[in-house]
């Protein structure tokens, strides 16, 4: 496995008294795509949300253990959570463009963390839209509302917004589940391109998608990390019978 960008050690997570993650120990390799699969409620999305402490926004939730990003524990009390979320961007299941222009959607996060001149911001917005393979479709209507775009375009706009702050890690929580097959294909191609510059973690219910886009796959069940390995190995020769049962559809 390549060097780890994130190392998760002895991670437990609680919603109030309910333990949603149980003693998770995995490495997320740098500039690779790691997919998390498993049945609904297994903890995939919860785990993803610990990587940028999204749970801090909600009372009664807590994480214990260590999540090391480049060797620094992001669960520490001294961490600037806003800066962390600039380093670890996130794209959600349904497209979530803000009710503002395409340009302002992309610039929104940048304005929170950087002071750029108009020319610098113009360049950053163009750069991010190109990264998200959306520039050619919107370059002549940057002042139009982000809500005017199609579903697939809106999700790519959210990816552009996510990369505009120049994060090191990009989290994708079922990013194509609300999209049609053509838009899904475009996002999958984009993920393959983006891993040259970013460490990517993706949650997906679609095992075929995990097989297509990821380098490593982790199978979770009821808050436990059952198995993680290279995607080809997980899908063709898993070490755990529980993984094989899920992959082959015998689960449940």
Curated annotation (Swiss-Prot):
Signal peptide: none
Primary localization class, coarse: membrane
Gene Ontology CC annotations of this record: plasma membrane
Keywords noted in UniProt: ATP-binding, Cell inner membrane, Cell membrane, Membrane, Nucleotide-binding, Phosphate transport, Translocase, Transport
Binding site for ATP: 38-45
Record's bilayer topology term: Peripheral membrane protein
Known function: Part of the ABC transporter complex PstSACB involved in phosphate import. Responsible for energy coupling to the transport system.
Protein's name in the database: Phosphate import ATP-binding protein PstB
Organism of provenance: Psychrobacter cryohalolentis (strain ATCC BAA-1226 / DSM 17306 / VKM B-2378 / K5)
Underlying gene: pstB
């Amino acid at each position: 496995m390549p060097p780890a960008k994130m190392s998760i050690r002895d991670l437990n997570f609680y919603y109030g008294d309910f333990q949603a993650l149980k003693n998770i120990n995995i490495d997320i390799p740098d500039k690779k795509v790691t997919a998390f699969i498993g049945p609904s409620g297994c903890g995939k999305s919860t785990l993803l949300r610990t990587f940028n402490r999204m749970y801090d926004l909600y009372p009664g939730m807590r994480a214990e253990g260590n999540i090391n990003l480049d060797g620094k524990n992001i669960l520490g009390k001294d961490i600037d959570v806003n800066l962390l979320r600039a380093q670890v961007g996130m794209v959600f299941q349904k497209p979530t463009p803000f009710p503002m222009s395409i340009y302002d959607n992309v610039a929104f996060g940048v304005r929170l963390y950087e002071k750029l001149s108009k020319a610098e911001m113009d360049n950053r917005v163009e750069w991010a839209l190109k990264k998200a393979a959306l520039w050619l479709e919107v370059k002549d209507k940057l002042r139009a509302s982000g809500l005017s775009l199609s579903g697939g375009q809106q999700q790519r706009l959210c990816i552009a917004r996510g990369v505009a702050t120049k994060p090191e890690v990009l989290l994708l929580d079922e990013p194509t589940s609300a999209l049609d097959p053509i838009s899904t294909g475009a996002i999958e191609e984009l993920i393959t391109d983006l891993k040259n510059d970013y460490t990517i973690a993706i949650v997906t219910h679609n095992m075929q998608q995990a097989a297509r886009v990821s380098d490593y796959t982790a199978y979770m069940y009821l808050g436990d990390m059952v198995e993680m390995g290279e995607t080809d190995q997980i899908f063709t020769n898993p070490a755990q019978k529980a993984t094989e049962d899920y992959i082959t559809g015998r689960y449940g």
